[in-house]
Design a protein with these regions (language model features):
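Iron-sulfur cluster-binding cysteine motifs and their immediate structural context
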Residues: 1-19
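Iron-sulfur-associated redox domains of electron-transfer enzymes in respiratory
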Residues: 16-229
Length: 229
């Protein structure tokens, strides 16, 4: 999706800005919680989750947490699938674009795709269970999350990109307060958005071989190899 947006020669692709939706939830008095992708640490130099939480509260959010909380739930589900040993091949992907690629162009390998929700969905579900009636806004780098929200609306109510958050903060005069210390610690689930991060976060079973694939071309090659046996 990002590629289509960048290269479209007619400039026909337009990103949907979900900031008005997020603002609307806040303005009408909903309790709004932010699920922040762990890649924020790469997007914002010197930022930790406490600094991010403080800024988001100034915008009107009730609270904010890392999507990595959901990733911890997801990685446990992956480990259960491996422990059950019902599948000899398991495709794990938290990337909505890759999952859509499989559904549209590689339906033959769909049985191998782990039936596990994404970290964003898991975190959203957890927040909504803990705070009935709350709205959840995902904040991250990927525009395909907007489509994921549309397809699975029970978990998260809208998705913002970091660019949209930047514009909202600038418009509202909100800046990061770098005096906030991160008291949450790390956790292996923060590795999820990195290359091979899902595998790095898991407890490895020596009876299985683990491979990580990055990039659309390599993903397609790997899917074709699985399809062809």
């Amino acid at each position: 999706r990002d590629r289509c947006y960048v290269i479209c020669p007619q400039n026909a692709k337009r990103l949907r800005d979900d900031t008005p939706s997020a603002k609307g939830f806040i303005d009408r008095g909903d309790e709004v919680y932010a699920s922040v992708a762990p890649s924020y640490i790469a997007n914002y130099k010197g930022i930790n989750i406490e600094i991010m939480r403080s800024a988001l509260k100034k915008l009107g959010f009730k609270d904010a947490g890392e999507t990595a909380i959901g990733a911890t739930i997801v990685k446990r589900e992956y480990e259960k699938l491996i422990e059950n040993r019902k599948q000899s091949v398991i495709i794990s992907s938290c990337c909505h674009s890759v999952n859509t690629l499989i559904q549209k162009h590689y339906p033959d390998v769909l049985p191998y795709l782990a039936n596990v929700i994404s970290p964003m969905q898991a975190h959203g579900q957890l927040i909504k269970n803990q705070h009935p009636g709350a709205k959840v806004v995902f904040i991250g780098p990927c525009i395909s999350k907007k489509d994921e929200v549309d397809k699975y609306p029970d978990y998260v109510d809208c998705a913002l990109t970091f660019d949209e958050l930047n514009d909202w903060m600038a418009e509202s005069g909100v800046e990061f307060d770098f005096s906030q210390e991160d008291m949450t610690g790390g956790g292996r689930a923060r590795w999820f958005p990195t290359r091979g991060g899902i595998i790095e976060s898991m407890d490895i079973d020596d009876d299985f071989s683990y491979f990580s694939v990055d990039g659309i071309e390599d993903c397609m090659n790997a899917l074709e190899d699985i399809r062809d046996g």
